[in-house]
Amino acid sequence: MGKRLLDKLWERHVVATNENGLDLLYIDLHLVHEVTSPQAFEGLRLTNRTVRRPDLTFATMDHNIPTKDVWNITDRIAKQQLDTLRENCKQFQVPLADIGDEEQGIVHVIGPELGLTQPGKTIVCGDSHTATHGAFGALAFGIGTSEVEHVLATQTLWQRKPKAMGIELKGKLQKGVYAKDIILHLLSKYGVAVGTGYVMEFYGETIQAMEMEERMTLCNMAIEGGAKAGIIAPDEKTVAYVKGRKYAPKDYETFEKKWSELYTDADAMYDLHISIDVTDLAPYVTWGTNPSMGVRIDEKLPEKHDVNDERAFSYMGLSPGQSTYDIPVQHVFIGSCTNSRLSDLEIAASVVKGRKVKEGVRALVVPGSKRVRDAAMQKGLHHIFEEAGFEWREPGCSMCLGMNPDQVPEGEHCASTSNRNFEGRQGKGARTHLVSPAMAAAAALYGHFVDIRKESYDGAISYS
């Protein structure tokens, strides 16, 4: 019997196995940010320990930083967390991408762009969306603060091996339909618990056609389906993406050979298998308070089936049978570790070029990193956004979560390219709708959702 990609990644990192069936995994890369690390570093101090492998640890500031004026941090707790991370990294000799550094950005954006993320690695971070890095054929997952301390101290982690789920994606996406729509479709069909106890492996002709940044979007939201991680076998596109980046391997040919072995064998069996044909897939919009509460843009909102639906409709101020086109949009957020990379910004810019944001709509573009921001500005994207009426911000997690000044007011609706739409996620009483960058950009122009596949809806939508 052949091996799955998960098996190969797991077996390469098992240091020991205990009597309870838990495996001690060696961790190749530990990513750190300001929110989940303070107690972990303090735990090292209290036990007089050091960071075992500072060279395999990398920290950045992302969750709490303001994106309008990065140096003016008025929130006392946010400032304390940022200052604490700076002090901890200095004391324990951990590399830090500080505010203003060219390497600073959202942790799951800078890992790949710096070449820290590589095929075959085990990668952890005190953040749910660590699964993003699985797009490179890495086993990457989020951990809690006590586990952050364990990895800092030992460079290992006790884990129970998950089961393997194969998700085959077949067909070619229509124009205006993206990886974000695939994952929202998957969640709407199978729910937020389908992946519980599993690692999702995405594969198939649709994956082969995708560029790396869309693959990252898919893996990023595997956690929203309950999965431990999302993974994609590395291929030529993966190798080309990593090659030449700052922290990429210098002995490239040796690593490339090892990476070529990372795939699921033809005779291997998944514990669970799902097949999706994306040919007729449409853009998706979430209407409720978890990522599985989504519909195609050309569908009506569903009927109420249980108390959860009842509560979601009430919180969102929407009704069963309502058209998605009738959902008002007062805020637009293009950013987050899901959709803030250069290709995401290029797609959004192509939609709004030469157009104007609807009066009464507040629209933000927040690049995922300093490097993304600089690259976008070199292409003139900031001019396109600003001329359209968008705010062009500094990199950070921003409006994805209500931990910094970028928040949605109570009772107002936001078209967001982020990954979670829970109650209060973007601020107290905020109503979040998850969409692709193209859909978010179009919503900014009209003040409601439109079908980006159509060249006109109340007027022309520019694609160039």
Curated annotation (Swiss-Prot):
Iron as UniProt keyword: yes
UniProt cofactor(s): [4Fe-4S] cluster
EC number: 4.2.1.33
InterPro entries from the UniProt entry: 3-IsopropMal_deHydase_lsu, Acnase/IPM_dHydase_lsu_aba_1/3, Acoase/IPM_deHydtase_lsu_aba, Aconitase_4Fe-4S_BS, Aconitase_4Fe-4S_dom, IPM_dehydratase_rel_enz, IPMI_cat
GO biological process, alphabetically ordered: L-leucine biosynthetic process
Binding site for [4Fe-4S] cluster: 337, 397, 400
Pfam families listed in its UniProt record: Aconitase
Record has Amino-acid biosynthesis as a keyword: yes
Catalytic activity: (2R,3S)-3-isopropylmalate = (2S)-2-isopropylmalate
Pathway involvement of the protein, from the record: Amino-acid biosynthesis; L-leucine biosynthesis; L-leucine from 3-methyl-2-oxobutanoate: step 2/4
Keywords tagged on the record: 4Fe-4S, Amino-acid biosynthesis, Branched-chain amino acid biosynthesis, Iron, Iron-sulfur, Leucine biosynthesis, Lyase, Metal-binding
GO molecular function, one term: metal ion binding
Entry note: cofactor: Binds 1 [4Fe-4S] cluster per subunit.
HAMAP family per UniProt: LeuC_type1
Free-text function comment from the UniProt entry: Catalyzes the isomerization between 2-isopropylmalate and 3-isopropylmalate, via the formation of 2-isopropylmaleate.
Subunit details: Heterodimer of LeuC and LeuD.
Family membership: Belongs to the aconitase/IPM isomerase family. LeuC type 1 subfamily.
Entry protein name: 3-isopropylmalate dehydratase large subunit
Gene (UniProt): leuC
